[in-house]
Every structure is written in C-alpha cells, then in structure tokens.
Amino acid sequence: MEHNRQQLRLMQLSSSSLPVGSFTWSQGLEWAVEAGWITTDAEFKRWQIQQMEQSFFCVDLPLFIRLYRACEQNDAVSARRWTAYLLACRETRELREEERNRGAAFTRLIKSWEPDCPQEWLPLFSQSQLCGMAWLGVRWEISAHELALSLGYSWIESAVMAGVKLVPFGQQAAQRLIIELSDHFAAGLEHAWRRGDDELGAATPLSAIASARHETQYSRLFRS
C-alpha cells in the first residue's frame, strides 16, 4: 500500500499537468530555431543531447542529489549553498527567471500539500524547483534515484513538446525522440550521480547566446 502511494506521488510530480510552467519556457530553443541552427528532428536531437550531457548531467542532476542529501539531514545551510550555486550556473537572466518562477509555483503547491512545512525552507523552494522537489521527495519517502528519473523524463518531455511547436515535427517523431532521449538519459545517469564537487558546472555557450538573444526576438511563443 505504502509503495503504491509513493509511486502515485512520483507520477504526479512527473506529470505534464503539474502547474509550474514547464511548458512556457524554451531554454533558448526558440531562438536556435529562428537562427536556423535547428531545422529537423535530427538536429533537435543533437541539440538536446548536448544540453543533457553538458548541462543537465553536469549541473541539474548532481546538484539535485546534493539538495536531496541536505534535505535528508535537515541541513538548510547546505541546501542554501547548493541552491545559490544552481542559480549561479544559469547563464542568462531568462534562465534564472525560469528557475525562480518554477520554484515559486512549486512552493505554492508544497504549501498546499504540506502546510506544516518548516518556514525556513520556503524561501529556498521559491528560488529553485529542484530544492522543493528534493524536500518533498524526502517528506514523501521517494528515493533520490526515482526522483532523478522523474526529473529527467519531465525535462525531456518539456523539450520535445517545445520542439513540436517550433522545429516543427509531428507527434510520432516526438514519441520516438522521447524514447531515444530517455535511453540516452538512462545510460548517463550513473556517471552524473557520481560527479564530485570539483566537476560541477556547465559550458554551453550556444545555449546561453540563444537564451540571451531570445529576449529581443521579434515574435515569440515562449516566455522570456
């Protein structure tokens, strides 16, 4: 019974219907398409694999693991440090605003689901959804590994759905891309899990340029 409950909670957290605005940001993809860098589903796949290998595996995933451990130990000082580190790794104002907006939306959910959440943690959640997700995973007794898979799938699905609108490509291609990118994520998960503190950080200059240029793009579907 308890395991079933945990699995259902995990499905809820990975659901595309979770009201945190994940489908309102393109993370630079919209400008990359406008610039002609991405014109096919194959080019989209290469772009997303680069983002996964050079950013998600180097920043998001290893920092999530550190945040989860901090929440396990009720260590708000460490959680504050890693949340600040995460924001520092977001290379543009648009990416930082996305992080904070999603964090604020997720904080509202946590306050509704867990009204007895300690007040000192709420400002951290509002800075990053990753911190709130880690705390909620500990509270709901969902393992870090399962939550990491959920985060990866949500990230992949959001990116592919943005690609459907922007590149564009059809739903059949989208489902194939989700499978292929999920396989790539599963293959790289363990290495990302073992990254040391001195291996944290991303170098994705094209993504940063695309995100920065998106602000002045003449016509946009996604937020900036």
Curated annotation (Swiss-Prot):
Keyword Cytoplasm assigned: yes
Protein location: Cytoplasm
Chaperone in keyword set: yes
Domain of life assignment: Bacteria
A cellular component annotation (GO) from this entry: cytoplasm
InterPro entries with a match to the protein in the record: UreF, UreF_sf
Major subcellular location class: cytoplasm
UniProt GO molecular function: nickel cation binding
A Pfam short name: UreF
Keywords: Chaperone, Cytoplasm, Nickel insertion
Function: Required for maturation of urease via the functional incorporation of the urease nickel metallocenter.
Quaternary structure and partners: UreD, UreF and UreG form a complex that acts as a GTP-hydrolysis-dependent molecular chaperone, activating the urease apoprotein by helping to assemble the nickel containing metallocenter of UreC. The UreE protein probably delivers the nickel.
Family affiliation: Belongs to the UreF family.
Name of protein: Urease accessory protein UreF
Organism: Enterobacter sp. (strain 638)
High-level lineage: Bacteria, Pseudomonadati, Pseudomonadota, Gammaproteobacteria, Enterobacterales
